[in-house]
Amino acid sequence: MSKKSLGLDVRLELEGLISNDDTIRSEKDGRQASIFRVAELDARTEADNLRSIIHQSAREGNVNALQEALLKAPLAVNAQDGDFMTPLHYAARYGNYDAVKLLLSKNALPNTKNREGDTPLHIASKYIYGYSDICSIIDEDQADSARKYNTATKKIINALVSENAEIDPVNKYQLTPLHYAAMKSNFSALHALIKLKADVDAEDDNKMTPLLLACVHGSQEIIQELIKANSNVTKRDQRLNTVFHIVALRGEPEYLEMMMDHDPVEAIKALNLFNNEKKTPLRMAVEGNHPETLKKILQMEKKNSCKWMDREKELIHFAAEKGFLEVLKALVEAGGNKNELNEVKAVPLHVAAQMNQLEVVSYLIEEEKDNIDVVDEQGLTPLMMAVTHDSKKCVEYLIAKKANLTITDKDERTPVFIGAKFNALSSVEYILDHLRKKNKETERSALKSPTRNTLRIVSEDVRRTMVNMVDRDQNTPMHIVASNGYLEMMQLLQKHGASITQVNEDEETALHRAAIGGQTGAVRQLLEWDIRLLLMKDEMGNSALHLAARSGHDATTKVLLDNGADKEAKNSYQKTPLQVAVDSGKLETCQRLVAKGAQIESSSDTKTVLHTAAFYGNESIVRYFIAEGVTIDRRDEEGKTAFDIACENDHKDVARAFLETDQWKNLMIPCDVIPLDKHRNPVNMKRRTPFRTLLTKFPELASFVMDNCIEKSKEETDSTQSVAYNFEFLDDTYMMRCVSDDGTGEQLIGCKSAYDEDFKLEKDAQSYASNYDRVYKYHPLKLMADAEKLHLLNHPLSKALLKYKWNRLGRPMYYFALFMYLVFIVSLTQYVRHTKAPYNVWNEESYYDSEYFDENETCPQINTTKPDVVWKIIIQTLAVCQILVECFQLFQRKFAYLVNWENWIDCFIYSTALITVYDFSECSATSGVRQNWQWILAALCIFFGWINLLFMIRKMPRFGIFVVMFVDIVKTFFRFFPVFVLFIIAFSSSFYVILQNRPEFSTIFMSPLKTTVMMIGEFEFTGIFHGDETTHAEKMFGPAHTAVACALFFFFCIIMTILLMNLLVGLAVDDIKGVQEKAELKRLAMQVDLVLQIEASLHFFIQRTKKYATCRYATFPYGKLHKTGFAGWWSNFRRRFGLSVSTDPEIDEMYEREAEFTSEMTQKLQNQAAKLKNIQENIDVMYEKQVRLEAIIAKLATGLNINIELEEKDN
């Protein structure tokens, strides 16, 4: 048998199977079951049979069989079946007293509970008849007699209780046997339980007592028996219902009367009790439509101090609404006011008429004929209320009773108007037919005696027919039904002379209202009646097509267009239906209008539909109109394109839709204008370009634009490929100067390119800010760095611009300045190194005092070597040049120069260097020894000079990141410094007090310094605590003195050298980690700062020459890939140290990326090869196991004479 025929796909471990298993035999081997197992099975089967016999015998009352079975299995007397029922449960369930006695004599447990928690006492109380009684009892009288005088139940209950059965056990629902007896009307059980002192006021889960359950489910005898047993009639269930609530709702006057006779006082009190639905027994009787019960309660209410009319509100309204006529009459006869007002000031007649309760309406009108036209707070009469629900019978009756048909409500609506609004077709038709008949009768009577007065009345009735009477807003019934689309009602009104051209206060016709509501059928019907309705406009000049388009009703729009509606009609805002649809964002309607020939744009309109769609952020509409060929770069009155509007209103998806078009470059052209003063200096204004807006709001879209600014001439694999970078939007420093619009001055405009055909600056190009620090601060590259947009800074276009600026100007200027500064600082160091300190000059006998050179003009013959005059000249020359450069920068950058602390350090270094090398006395000139204050100044100058070199190196991409780490650590330390100082002050003050005799702690100023030094490990423990006791400066004064000093020293070692120093190290590590995580961002940000600062320093020459700036830059990526030998090594060396002459930002990292990519791909291929090998091995193992499994299955099938036939199926 092949593995395909088996069709098995399983994973089994077959090693554990025994190939020669002797326990597996065929039928021929004649294997037999164990005799011990057969005996065990037979015993278990016999026990189960005995338990079944015991349960069955107890159920059937077969005492002999039960006794015989119990003799064989006495322990099965309490056996439970699947429902946890014992034989005692079944015997009690079917009223088998003899079986109950036998079971109890055999030690049956009377308190055992079944699955529902019922004991045998529960079961005996719950079920009334025995098993044999059910078939024998036929008539109802016999059933009542059996229920009342069932002696078996009493005997069973007494027997159970005599054997210590609990009298009030509760099941899982907290029901006692007495609850069951009351619920099932088991009188015998109830009587027996009460006699045995069962709790008549026990409560179940719903706080229902037996009396409450009896009122719901029981009989009069049960209730009477419970009342005799002093059951509490004031108990309330979980819904706060009393027995009076329940019997009132059920409508049992006998029960109610019985409880009233039992305790009249409590009955009266119960009338004032509310349940959780805020209902009294009186209200429940009304809601249950039980007039007899209601009359009993009303009789009791006469004795109640709290009158039911004051307590109960709108009872008559409820009865009138439901049509409970007898209940209504009973309430009225008991003193109820049938003209009572509810919360909306309506009388019961309103409610009855509304719900079409004709009998109630008739009764109320017959009693009070003057109330036929009574109104509620909305001014609605009973006739109007009947019309709202199309209660035709009541309408006919009220009209027959002379109800006023011309009366109006507070909104001046007639019954016909209200019926039209609620589409009460039959009622309105009846009213209109009635009015037509009445008008004809009036006409005939008037024509018989044609006086001037009667003729005037007839003509006025004709003119003001009911179907054309308007409401407060001048809407006719036709307006309302048209807006709701009630076609049959429209036809009915039109049949009776309704006007379709009448307008409301907004000058809207019924067609306008139908168009607003999108009622296509109503629109079609109105146009069939009068096509001229298309020409009518509302007070805002909107046609029906305008209104349908604004609401986005596509089908209605189609009907209007098919009937010849004007597609180019303009409303008071000079908007066409298409523009209105765009305002509302209705794409389907726009498509419908365009498909029908609506004009998308006009040459006279500055604002197109795209501007509107972009303002509201309707991306789908924008894309649709772009596909239709709308001009996307048209500008409105403010010079903004639709793209500008989308960006201003933060509609990112709309902006993306514009940028995905072929005309994206036209959208990126700025339209900002910066005025010039009389000196041709721009006023202080920020540039507002589309690209800057994208940088601020949508960086992802800015990256998309930057991608489009890179053009490649050929495929990536072509070695002759060239890449062109367009910097026009990224480097927007320059604008074109032209005459202002009013001709009185000049201005800078952004809509015209500042570059010529050769991509160089035009003659009239000018920076948009005279202070180039503003250009530096708000340059797009700087904005990217400040916002930490690494993906934008790392974009090839940004890197290309940085590389271009660095190679053309930044690199030569930076390295030239760095070289000159190195020459200066090295010369200053050499000069100081070869100059003797004023306190270190030897006079053949001793050293001179340093003040000697400050006080004497001439020097004695001293043996010292003067520094070479070359160093002095170099220092003076470079310092003077640098000071002039700083003055020039101050002139150019003005206040911005002063706020930069690096400029102050430069000025300090160069000025102090000049002062240091200057000879202020003849002694200094002849000996070269500086005066004391000069020497101190030289120390500060040399320190800040080298530190300044550190900050200059910080701007180098390769090494600057480490300086950034150091600066971040210093900043963190100074944030921690207040805590650090407090520890220093605490320990130094204590050491000053306890070790004041020692020189290092002798003053309050030296002690902090020594304490700080001790933090780095210079403790001098032996010198402090084990010095010469004979010397005052090393002596410890007594044991207490020594103990305090040791304790302080111990805490100092723990806190300052271990805890505090480790804390500082941890903070430093975190700072370094943070810088490393943003290393690429920091590097690019520093490069941006360096390049832009150099431009800011030299912008005067840049703008004069106009040769440096460009908007387009092309490279050949594969131009240097063929360099080998020394040329390749030299190129790599220059690239590593930022000296590469390459102008392509991608080439500098190409080798590294290729190496990383190759290494990564190699590793992935190796991992995949290993995985494939592992998979192949697993497949081989699975195949072997499957073959073995097939062999085993085949042997088993052969041994068991099983024929296996499997069909082959294609996977």
UniProtKB/Swiss-Prot annotation:
Extracellular-facing ranges: 833-870, 916-932, 997-1004, 1026-1048
Descriptive protein name: Transient receptor potential cation channel subfamily A member 1 homolog
Intramembrane ranges, chain numbering: 1005-1025
Species in which this protein is naturally found: Caenorhabditis elegans
Ranges for the ANK repeats: 49-79, 83-112, 116-169, 173-202, 206-235, 239-270, 277-306, 311-340, 344-374, 378-407, 411-440, 473-502, 506-535, 540-569, 573-602, 605-634, 638-669
Transmembrane region(s): 812-832, 871-891, 895-915, 933-953, 976-996, 1049-1069
InterPro entries: Ankyrin_rpt, Ankyrin_rpt-contain_sf, Ion_trans_dom, TRP_cation_channel
Tissues/organs with expression: Expressed in many sensory neurons, including OLQ and IL1 neurons.
Membrane topology summary: Multi-pass membrane protein
Coiled-coil ranges (or none): 1149-1191
Similarity comment: family membership: Belongs to the transient receptor (TC 1.A.4) family.
Predominant location: membrane
Signal sequence, renumbered to the chain: none
Annotated glycan sites: 856, 863
Ion transport recorded as keyword: yes
Summary of the knockout phenotype: Worms exhibit specific defects in mechanosensory behaviors: abnormal head withdrawal reflex, defective reversal behavior in response to nose-touch and foraging behaviors.
